[in-house]
């Protein structure tokens, strides 16, 4: 019985993932990040308060701040490009 084809299966990850996460470590880190995002989404519906939920809420607020700063910077750059 040939068992070599048991390890041959199509990837469930999109091919573009190589650009974002070229190494196995980066892919695992990305998976961890996705799990945190899933937890954040779940946290929106619950009102449980514990040390872990406070930490997650603080991380979520930090991510929101970073994203808002990126958007703010993009708007400033777009306005400056119009003047050039």
Curated annotation (Swiss-Prot):
UniProt entry keywords in alphabetical sequence: Host nucleus, Viral genome packaging, Viral release from host cell
GO biological process: viral DNA genome packaging
InterPro entries assigned to the protein according to its UniProt record, in alphabetical order: Herpes_TT2
Compartment list: Host nucleus
Coiled-coil ranges per UniProt: none
Keyword Transmembrane: no
GO CC terms: host cell nucleus
Signal peptide: none
Principal location: host cell
Record has GTP-binding as a keyword: no
Domain of life: Viruses
Complexes and interactors: Associates with TRM1 and TRM3 to form the tripartite terminase complex.
Purpose of the protein: Component of the molecular motor that translocates viral genomic DNA in empty capsid during DNA packaging. Forms a tripartite terminase complex together with TRM1 and TRM3 in the host cytoplasm. Once the complex reaches the host nucleus, it interacts with the capsid portal vertex. This portal forms a ring in which genomic DNA is translocated into the capsid.
Family classification: Belongs to the herpesviridae TRM2 protein family.
Protein name: Tripartite terminase subunit 2
Source species: Alcelaphine herpesvirus 1 (strain C500) (AlHV-1)
């Amino acid at each position: 019985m040939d068992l070599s084809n048991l390890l041959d299966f199509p990837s469930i990850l999109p091919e573009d993932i190589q650009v974002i996460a070229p190494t196995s470590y980066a892919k695992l880190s990305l998976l961890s990040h996705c799990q945190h995002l899933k937890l954040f989404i779940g946290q929106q519906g619950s009102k449980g308060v514990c040390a872990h939920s406070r930490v997650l809420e603080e991380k979520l607020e930090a991510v929101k701040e970073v994203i808002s700063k990126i958007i703010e910077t993009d708007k400033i750059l777009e306005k400056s490009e119009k003047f050039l």
